[in-house]
């Protein structure tokens, strides 16, 4: 399951509640984001070791700024609320899961 983030507070609450969180920062106008979105959903459906969330950077510029998002799509892996890894650009499901595992 993928959760659509509605506020910075909601994202921070998820970080407090979940050890592992994978965030997809995206925008509706972004072509590679449109390709990544179904892959991110597939990864979430198959991988239960992390909470998967999406942040629309156009709707939540404050969150994008807080996490220094400058390119899209950006997928960030957090552990206990701390950024561990970051990848930019289109990613297939297997690469998203590998980003978390490696």
Curated annotation (Swiss-Prot):
UniProt-listed PROSITE patterns: THIOREDOXIN_1, THIOREDOXIN_2
Protein's job: Participates in various redox reactions through the reversible oxidation of its active center dithiol to a disulfide and catalyzes dithiol-disulfide exchange reactions.
UniProt xrefs under PANTHER family: GEO12009P1
Membrane-crossing segments per the record: none
UniProt keyword annotation of Transcription present: no
Keyword Disulfide bond tagged: yes
Protein name (record): Thioredoxin
Cystines in this chain: 30-33
Record family assignment: Belongs to the thioredoxin family.
One example of a Gene Ontology biological process annotation: cell redox homeostasis
Domain Thioredoxin: 2-102
Organism in which the protein naturally occurs: Mycoplasma genitalium (strain ATCC 33530 / DSM 19775 / NCTC 10195 / G37)
Protein encoded by which gene: trxA
NCBIfam families on file: thioredoxin
Domain of life: Bacteria
Parts forming coiled coils: none
Keywords: Disulfide bond, Electron transport, Redox-active center, Transport
Molecular function per GO: protein-disulfide reductase activity
Cited InterPro entries: Thioredoxin, Thioredoxin-like_sf, Thioredoxin_CS, Thioredoxin_domain
